[in-house]
From Swiss-Prot:
Its cofactor is Mg(2+). GO terms for biological process: lysyl-tRNA aminoacylation. Homodimer. Mg(2+) 1 binds at E433, E440. One of its GO terms (molecular function) is lysine-tRNA ligase activity. CDD domains: LysRS_core, LysRS_N. The gene is lysS. It is found in: Cytoplasm. It catalyses: tRNA(Lys) + L-lysine + ATP = L-lysyl-tRNA(Lys) + AMP + diphosphate. InterPro entries: Aa-tRNA-synt_II (IPR004364), aa-tRNA-synth_II (IPR006195), aa-tRNA-synth_II/BPL/LPL (IPR045864), Lys-tRNA-ligase_II (IPR002313), Lys-tRNA-ligase_II_N (IPR044136), Lys-tRNA-synth_II_C (IPR018149), NA-bd_OB-fold (IPR012340), NA-bd_OB_tRNA (IPR004365). Binds 3 Mg(2+) ions per subunit. This is Lysine--tRNA ligase. The lineage of its organism: Bacteria, Pseudomonadati, Pseudomonadota, Gammaproteobacteria, Alteromonadales.
Amino acid sequence: MTDKANNTPVAQDENKLIAERRVKLEKIRSNCSANGFPNDFNREHLAADIQAEHGEKTKEELEELQVTYAIAGRVMAKRGPFLVIQDSSGRIQGYAEKTVQKEIRAKWGSLDIGDIVGIKGILHKSGKGDLYVNMDHYSLLTKSLRPLPEKFHGLSDQETKYRQRYIDLIINEDTRNTFKMRSKIVAGIRNFLTQRDFMEVETPMLQIIPGGATAKPFMTHHNTFDLDMYLRIAPELNLKRLVVGGFDRVFEINRSFRNEGISTRHNPEFTMIEFYQAYADYHDLMNTTEEMLRTIAQDVLGTTTIRNTVKNSEGEVVEEKFYDLGKPFVRLSMVDAILQYGKDHRGAEQLDEAALRDPENNFDAIKAMAKAVGVKENSASKVWGPGKYICEIFEEVAEHLLDQPTFITEYPWEVSPLARRNDENSFITDRFEFFVGGRELANGFSELNDAEDQAERFQKQVAEKDAGDDEAMHYDADYINALEYGLPPTAGEGIGIDRLVMLFTDSPTIKDVILFPHMRPEAE
């Protein structure tokens, strides 16, 4: 099979460079007893640590200190007697003068940009103020057979960045910083919860019955059991089983899977944190969420004000937005959000506050409002009740306008099959979703612990599935059985890690914060 891409001038030039590098590797192998990839260099220091310790010292101070450092990393540039070496922490220069360090410079004939080397020597500072290691030892540790992208252009092709993330990480410091930030955010969440006596647990990825969210699952087959199974869409039901069992505070940070579309905010495989607390309600969780995000922002970013930007096709910033996590978050009911944000939407004249606040007695008016504002119906709409229509109206007219940190509360029970009904108004539940910049980041509620009510809601979900809604939940008899043993008053929440990282790192698409996002196979 012929790869048409290999016939382009760029591909032909690359193939020539690869061939030249293979020749160099063969020469290296022929001149040494090993295989050309030695593993005997002891790296003792990182570039960033050296820069932090000695960056402010003068040239004269370093010459007096005469400190020796051993570093290793990838060669990113060759400039006369200097090599620019990049390790996991940053960059530093190595120096070898051809008339003094002849033996070392002789080895540079086989050196290419992208090779991995180890160097050792005394630290100095150049006249321009740059630190460098004056080499008395040099080892080629790994020969890079493929050339890195052109240094002046870097790696700008988005497809290549996502498909070959390893190249992106080598070339782009911003990408490396994004994933370092992601690691710190996850660690911050874990530390925040464990310091408050939450226990981290692991629950199954493979499930016989998918549950815990309304979403279409991925299917697989267990050969030994001859059993169809599902990749989990959420860990919720198993985590609440643990609360039934006596673990009052639990959390899990792990992957979930939903067989749905891909967008700038959705990836079929994604990471979330779910946590559950006995003897708490959804108000407690809103308070916890505020404190958690504020704490993590301060620890990771050094500020509670988050800057996000909108860029044009040239990468130039055309708009800045600032989200203040230091102020109390807005709390707004779903109906109030519709009335506040929907007033400028098409069909706004149809929005009837009285009907929205008494939907069960104004179902026809609710449906008329939904049609007026542009809600699209589908094959499952025939089983929608007023609560589902109100939620669709909210998503159409208000959700994308929730810019500053906002909790939306009072979700109808119809769209909240696992949430506890409100004591004063049984049409709504004690549930919230959290939004920043028009993105949903979290979903939490006081848990439904009435086994009979839960069974009825599962049955309604089954009816919706039978009507064509492939995202509706299955009936989970074992979960009902667990509730019948008694779930204490409990509140639980899920936060999308990927979207949270997008917010904290000013990333416009979810693919920028997932190391290896799902992509369509490349055309042959």
